[in-house]
Structures are given as structure tokens and as C-alpha cells.
Amino acid sequence: MMVCPGKPGASLLMLSMLFHIIDSYPNNEMARGGCDECRLQENKIFSKPSAPIFQCVGCCFSRAYPTPLRSKKTMLVPKNITSEATCCVAREVTRLDNMKLENHTDCHCSTCYYHKF
């Protein structure tokens, strides 16, 4: 049986490279799955050193359940599963000159408005 001296060295090199890649993987939203609790977080894109901008980010619950029969009868296109979700939104919303102004100083889980204009 012939032993090649390069094989253990190559294996150790590959193993150390793998550990280096895993260790250097960023501990950011993608690494955590993007599901922290609903809270205020600084927006790095729009913030300036003298004027930080915060926004509500995080996960709230979502669930799916069988559609009740009485509801299914009233649907134009009946579906078997109904889903319900809440989003992380600003607690206080005011209007200023007919423009919605969201004051992101406190966050909570509430109705998702991302699809509404």
C-alpha cells in the first residue's frame, strides 16, 4: 500500500478553507433568515451621520387555515386555503398636506399595507 504525503495536507488545506468561509460568512439579515422581532432599526442606505433615519423591520406572524364554507360560497374564485398575515409597521401614522407621514419611533405588528396605495 502506497501512501501519498500530499493527500493529508490537501485535506487539511480544504478543511481550513471551509472553516474560513463559514467563519467569515456575514452575520446579517440573510444569515439569520431575516426574521428578527419587529423593532426600529437604522436604515443604512438613507441615513447620514448627522441625521440617522430609522424604520420598522422584523417579522410578525402569518398563518394559513382552511377557508370556512360560508366564506367560500361568496368568493368569485373559491379557494381552499385562507391566509392571514401581519407586518411590522409604524405605530403612528399622520397626514400632512394630503400626504401620509409615518413616524417610525415605535413599531408593532399590524395589517400589511405594502400592497395598498
UniProtKB/Swiss-Prot annotation:
<protein>
    <recommendedName>
        <fullName>Glycoprotein hormones alpha chain</fullName>
    </recommendedName>
</protein>
<keyword id="KW-0372">Hormone</keyword>
<dbReference type="GO" id="GO:0010893">
    <property type="term" value="P:positive regulation of steroid biosynthetic process"/>
</dbReference>
<feature type="signal peptide">
    <location>
        <begin position="1"/>
        <end position="24"/>
    </location>
</feature>
<dbReference type="GO" id="GO:0007186">
    <property type="term" value="P:G protein-coupled receptor signaling pathway"/>
</dbReference>
<dbReference type="GO" id="GO:0016914">
    <property type="term" value="C:follicle-stimulating hormone complex"/>
</dbReference>
<feature type="disulfide bond">
    <location>
        <begin position="60"/>
        <end position="109"/>
    </location>
</feature>
<feature type="disulfide bond">
    <location>
        <begin position="38"/>
        <end position="88"/>
    </location>
</feature>
<dbReference type="Pfam" id="PF00236">
    <property type="entry name" value="Hormone_6"/>
</dbReference>
<dbReference type="InterPro" id="IPR000476">
    <property type="entry name" value="Glyco_hormone"/>
</dbReference>
<feature type="disulfide bond">
    <location>
        <begin position="87"/>
        <end position="112"/>
    </location>
</feature>
<keyword id="KW-0964">Secreted</keyword>
<dbReference type="GO" id="GO:0010469">
    <property type="term" value="P:regulation of signaling receptor activity"/>
</dbReference>
<keyword id="KW-0325">Glycoprotein</keyword>
<dbReference type="GO" id="GO:0016913">
    <property type="term" value="F:follicle-stimulating hormone activity"/>
</dbReference>
<keyword id="KW-0732">Signal</keyword>
<comment type="function">
    <text>Shared alpha chain of heterodimeric glycoprotein hormones. These hormones bind specific receptors on target cells that in turn activate downstream signaling pathways. Involved in gametogenesis and steroidogenesis.</text>
</comment>
<dbReference type="InterPro" id="IPR029034">
    <property type="entry name" value="Cystine-knot_cytokine"/>
</dbReference>
<feature type="glycosylation site" description="N-linked (GlcNAc...) asparagine">
    <location>
        <position position="103"/>
    </location>
</feature>
<feature type="disulfide bond">
    <location>
        <begin position="35"/>
        <end position="59"/>
    </location>
</feature>
<comment type="similarity">
    <text>Belongs to the glycoprotein hormones subunit alpha family.</text>
</comment>
<keyword id="KW-1015">Disulfide bond</keyword>
<comment type="subunit">
    <text>Heterodimer. Glycoprotein hormones are heterodimers composed of a common alpha chain described here and a unique beta chain which confers their biological specificity to the different hormones.</text>
</comment>
<dbReference type="GO" id="GO:0006590">
    <property type="term" value="P:thyroid hormone generation"/>
</dbReference>
<dbReference type="GO" id="GO:0005615">
    <property type="term" value="C:extracellular space"/>
</dbReference>
<feature type="glycosylation site" description="N-linked (GlcNAc...) asparagine">
    <location>
        <position position="80"/>
    </location>
</feature>
<feature type="disulfide bond">
    <location>
        <begin position="56"/>
        <end position="107"/>
    </location>
</feature>
